[in-house]
């Protein structure tokens, strides 16, 4: 698949799906970026969160199709409006109005703004770099014995830094949503050579004198 103008693959893949749909009789597109069923499927998790926490200040949720953050935020805010929802995205994604650029790690972010995110209730946004995302995954594994994927690593680092610089006099109660496992990232995030090569690619070019 060719990369799209943002440096990702999503838009070209969607174009291919639309071409196949137009050429195929009785075809159906399960568009997770626009189908309300995506976020409505998370209402149950939102209710479970509410019943599990007597005190809850923040929920950190990564975005891609945005089903999770939309469904959880709508469900939680309806019952506990004081809980703050923090959306976590990666540099290069356009979901929160940033300019798109090449992303080397799948599973978080998108090359388009998902229509369903218009229904989300988001209080804060944290953008994590691709290298910090990798660091978050390794810290989760080394310090917490959690073998998680890209979205989880981004959420962990975002929450860790957020709490560090929080204005709260007491440590807030935060819930971190970890939606992915690490086994699909063995050849990327957890491959030391790959990670080192990515770090070299993402190093800023030296300034001319």
For each of these PLM feature ranges, what is it?
Residues 11-32, 148, 154-173:
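Structural signature of the thiamine diphosphate
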């Amino acid at each position: 698949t060719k990369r799209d103008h943002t440096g990702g693959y999503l838009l070209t893949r969607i174009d291919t799906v639309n071409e196949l749909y137009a050429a195929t009789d009785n075809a159906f597109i399960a568009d997770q970026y626009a189908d309300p069923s995506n976020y409505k499927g998370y209402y149950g998790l939102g209710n479970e969160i509410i019943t599990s926490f007597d005190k809850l200040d923040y929920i950190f949720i990564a975005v891609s199709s945005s089903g999770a953050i939309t469904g959880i935020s709508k469900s939680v805010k309806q019952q506990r409006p004081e809980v703050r929802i923090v959306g976590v995205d990666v540099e290069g994604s356009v979901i929160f109005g940033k300019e798109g650029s090449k992303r080397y790690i799948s599973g978080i972010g998108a090359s388009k703004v998902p229509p369903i995110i218009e229904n989300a209730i988001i209080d804060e946004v944290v953008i994590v770099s691709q290298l910090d995302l990798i660091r978050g995954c390794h810290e989760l594994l080394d310090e917490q014995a959690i073998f998680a994927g890209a979205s989880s690593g981004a959420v962990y680092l975002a929450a860790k830094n957020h709490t560090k610089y929080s204005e709260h006099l007491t440590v807030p109660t935060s819930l971190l949503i970890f939606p992915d496992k690490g086994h699909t990232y063995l050849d990327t995030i957890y491959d030391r050579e790959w990670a080192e090569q990515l770090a070299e690619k993402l190093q800023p070019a030296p300034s001319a004198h």
